[in-house]
């Protein structure tokens, strides 16, 4: 994969997310509300809420906003009646795409997702059409220069499944979703902070796109991520370092 840089792809995605901070806050608030409704208002006993809380903190969301979202969810107030829906489809070059949504209107959401795919050269698939290409797991990615031995020790003692370091020095830790909170706590205790972390759908194989195909795929991803009901978009695509 000449020109393919994991770190460049990570930074590229983070840059896109930072540019959409207002929308990111909306999505995090929705996640906090749903998590509090499903598992209660205490992040210490609700791992999903803890993860959403941490996302909010990383996005510099004021604590008052977080608390209001928790209260809405725990109290069953207006705005908490969302359901989670997953859509699967294909992008440029047959690249697999998973779109996770929270919605109060499935009919609206599927129409918007289908339109985004169709307008940007992709197509919405059937349930199960691409999910097998991804692994549901916890992921932590550390920047080049992070002490590999410290990461390795903390990760494995906390039950992580795999620790890998690429040629750039990017360290990736993978764990079972159920072990995510324990691994995160182990990193905190060791004074480590991941550049990217979360429970994700990790592609088992990658599709590298360059040139015009990469531009078209980026437009598709932007269109999907820009939809109000979309929480996360996962894809098998990696972009050439020059994109």
UniProtKB/Swiss-Prot annotation:
Residues covered by region (Disordered): 1-21
Species the sequence originates in: Bordetella petrii (strain ATCC BAA-461 / DSM 12804 / CCUG 43448)
Entry's Gene Ontology BP terms: regulation of DNA-templated transcription
SUPFAM superfamilies in the cross-refs: YebC-like
Superkingdom of this protein's organism: Bacteria
Pfam families: TACO1_YebC_N (PF20772), Transcrip_reg (PF01709)
Protein's cellular compartments: Cytoplasm
PANTHER family: TRANSCRIPTIONAL REGULATORY PROTEIN YEBC-RELATED, TRANSLATIONAL ACTIVATOR OF CYTOCHROME C OXIDASE 1
Keywords noted in UniProt: Cytoplasm, DNA-binding, Transcription, Transcription regulation
GO cellular component: cytosol
Protein's recorded name: Probable transcriptional regulatory protein Bpet3099
Family: Belongs to the TACO1 family.
Gene3D superfamilies the UniProt entry points to: 1.10.10.200, 3.30.70.980
Molecular function GO labels: DNA binding
InterPro entries: Integrase-like_N (IPR017856), TACO1_YebC-like_2nd/3rd_dom (IPR048300), TACO1_YebC_N (IPR049083), Transcrip_reg_TACO1-like (IPR002876), Transcrip_reg_TACO1-like_dom3 (IPR026564), YebC-like (IPR029072)
Primary residence: cytoplasm
HAMAP family: Transcrip_reg_TACO1
């Amino acid at each position: 994969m000449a020109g393919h840089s994991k770190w460049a792809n990570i930074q590229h995605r983070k840059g896109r997310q930072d540019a959409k901070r207002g929308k990111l806050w909306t999505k995090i608030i929705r996640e906090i509300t749903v998590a509090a409704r499903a598992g209660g208002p205490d992040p210490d006993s609700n791992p999903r809420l803890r993860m959403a809380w941490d996302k909010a903190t990383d996005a510099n969301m004021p604590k008052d906003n977080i608390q209001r979202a928790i209260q809405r969810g725990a109290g069953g107030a207006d705005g908490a009646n969302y359901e989670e829906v997953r859509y699967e489809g294909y992008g440029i070059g047959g690249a697999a795409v998973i779109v996770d949504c929270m919605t109060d209107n499935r009919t609206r959401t599927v129409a918007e997702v289908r339109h985004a795919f169709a307008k940007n050269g992709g197509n919405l698939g059937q349930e199960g059409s691409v999910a097998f290409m991804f692994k549901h797991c916890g992921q932590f990615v550390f920047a080049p220069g992070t002490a590999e031995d410290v990461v390795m020790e903390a990760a494995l003692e906390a039950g992580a499944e795999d620790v890998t370091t690429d040629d750039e020095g990017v360290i990736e830790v993978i764990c079972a979703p159920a072990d995510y909170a324990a691994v995160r706590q182990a990193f905190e205790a060791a004074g480590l902070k991941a550049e990217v972390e979360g429970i994700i759908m990790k592609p088992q194989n990658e599709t590298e796109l360059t040139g015009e195909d990469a531009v078209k795929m980026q437009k598709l991803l932007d269109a999907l991520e820009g939809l109000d009901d979309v929480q996360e978009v996962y894809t098998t695509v990696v972009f050439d370092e020059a994109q």
